[in-house]
């Protein structure tokens, strides 16, 4: 008998999977920072809710669902996708670099939020680019130079990025002014949450 290379008899909740680090949890979302080293694999885990995934850096993985065939996936820096609830799988990093991403679970209450308008540049040099727009969330890329500032409205998650991962992640309530706190350009991702007006 051939042994399953991706055993999934024992399934853990995503928050108990050690490569998924829970960084924000509230009534609307749970946000995880994920890092899987080359050759490493996750425990078999369950995604109970729809989720957005933003990829940091290039990566190659095998996603092996509990009931289905393993599939090789290639991601590029900045890829963003929405996945439906219910996936139970093992993820194996078959690439040569760490597979890093930010995963935001959309809890049922997120539908009660009203999404604010897109960020408004209020100073300096800022480029805002939409990379995902859906019914319950919008994901935007922000490139901010040292003098750059943007104003946001509504509930959101602000993620500042480094070349090799996440520098900071924070939950925003209501109006906020975001700026570059460095003498070099800053790359950030903004997850705006809730339904559109």
PLM regions: where:
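Hydrophobic alpha-helical transmembrane segments of multi-pass integral membrane proteins
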Residues: 44, 179-180
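Noncatalytic accessory or regulatory domains flanking protease catalytic cores in secreted, cell-surface
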Residues: 88, 176-178
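Short, conserved beta-strand element in jelly-roll/cupin
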Residues: 46-62, 144, 151-167, 171
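Residue-level "contact hotspot" at macromolecular interaction interfaces
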Residues: 35, 54, 71-74, 171
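Loop/turn positions that initiate beta-strands
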Residues: 78-79, 170, 174-176
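A short, N-terminal "cap"/entry segment at the start of jelly-roll beta-barrel domains
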Residues: 1-33, 41-43, 63-65, 70-84, ...
